[in-house]
Amino acid sequence: MSISEGEDQPGASSNRTARRAIDRSIASLAIPALGALVAEPLFLIVDSALIGHLGAEPLAGLAIASTILQTAVGLMIFLAYATTPLVARRRGAGDLRGAVQAGIDGLWLALGLGAVLGVALWAVSTPLVGFFGTDAGVASQAVTYLAVSCAGLPAMLVVFAATGLLRGLQDTRTPLFIATLGFAANALLNWWFIYGLGWGIAGSAWGTVAAQWAMVVVYLVVVTVHARRHGASLLPHRDGLSSAGRSGGWLFVRTIGLRAALMLTVAAAASHGTVATAGYQVVFTIFSTAAFALDALAIAAQALVGDALGARHAERARQVLRRTVFWGLACGAAIGLVLAATSPILGRVFSSDPEVLTVLPPSLLVLGLSLPLGGFVFVLDGVLMGAGDARYLAWTSLVNLAVYLPVLWAVTVLVPTGTIALVALTAAFTVVFMAARALTLGLRARGERWVTLGV
């Protein structure tokens, strides 16, 4: 054995040990986070299943109302993403009191925004539903569900912020537990209110609102325990609210850019007719499902990177970057291979329409082949969020949108309707748009400007 070989072995062993430790940390955060992410859409699935037995009008009303609600709530997801790095940095710096306080400030911000959003949405619920141009019966059902659901908006946003607090403390198991309880309560209350009390679609909305506020109560108990343990105040601090507001504002801009890309892609699909729109809905549903696994890795990256930078361990933050990118690519490739292999038959799960089934397989193949790129993007997004690089994420989301728009215009205007249209739409979003995001995120991650140490 040479001297150099003898010297390299301890270093190699140390690197392997570090990688394994980071991998264990990633798994301990990502796996429960995945469970909590999967639980969230189950609320709507339960509502759909129960309301569907009331007839076509209530189900159509739910479709419209839930679209409005999901759009409004989706724009507020920054409350979780902004709170996590603020808490994680302070935890990494050893300031657990400050970490919990930052999370509590986020809760108050969420409550205030939720109250304003709830009142505003309630006030315009009728004209918003009217925008969809449905008949009077469906519109009435939609307005009923939407108006009642507005009472739960503050609770939904508080849950976002509380989840972000616990993620920052590297606790993803408690959110999974609370989400599971909330799902069970939602199912039972909805059944009772809809069928036991005969409240119809309003009963479904009230059941969900009650479950959401019950989740808030449980979260507040958990947060109070943390506050008392570490000496944090349950009242908001002005500086903390300002900090959360600044970070959240930039992440809100980022979310606007992403939502605009999604909505414009749907509009492009609609321009190619019913078959393309239905096919795109199937493709996007599968993409969203695959994204749960990739988003769970991004959540782990947020918490671990924020903690490492708060502790002034730049190399550990880079190690987290490397390992989460590895797992993002690996998970994307694994899911993509399964999707590509099943692309000829997977569409039958979602549709029995012969035309839709004809256009789906090539598009699902494109989606499967693009998922490693998606894994790369999701993870780097989480890394830069954890680093608190919100301003960069905001501006580049607008740049990415600007790059995407001409491509989407070309797909809308120049591509003929049919199978090629759906393939082009799928490639535009999952390849072109994701490649633009990969470039802007990758360039940032290769540099050092995101590595800001301390609190």
Q: Where does each model-flagged region fall?
A:
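Small-residue-rich hydrophobic transmembrane alpha-helices
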Residues: 59-119, 159-175, 279-343, 376-388, ...
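Alpha-helical transmembrane segments of multipass membrane proteins
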Residues: 45-49, 127, 161-165, 187-192, ...
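Small-residue-enriched core segments of transmembrane alpha-helices in multipass membrane transport
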Residues: 179-186, 285-286, 398-407
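Hydrophobic/small/kink-forming positions within alpha-helical transmembrane segments
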Residues: 78, 183-184, 213, 296, ...
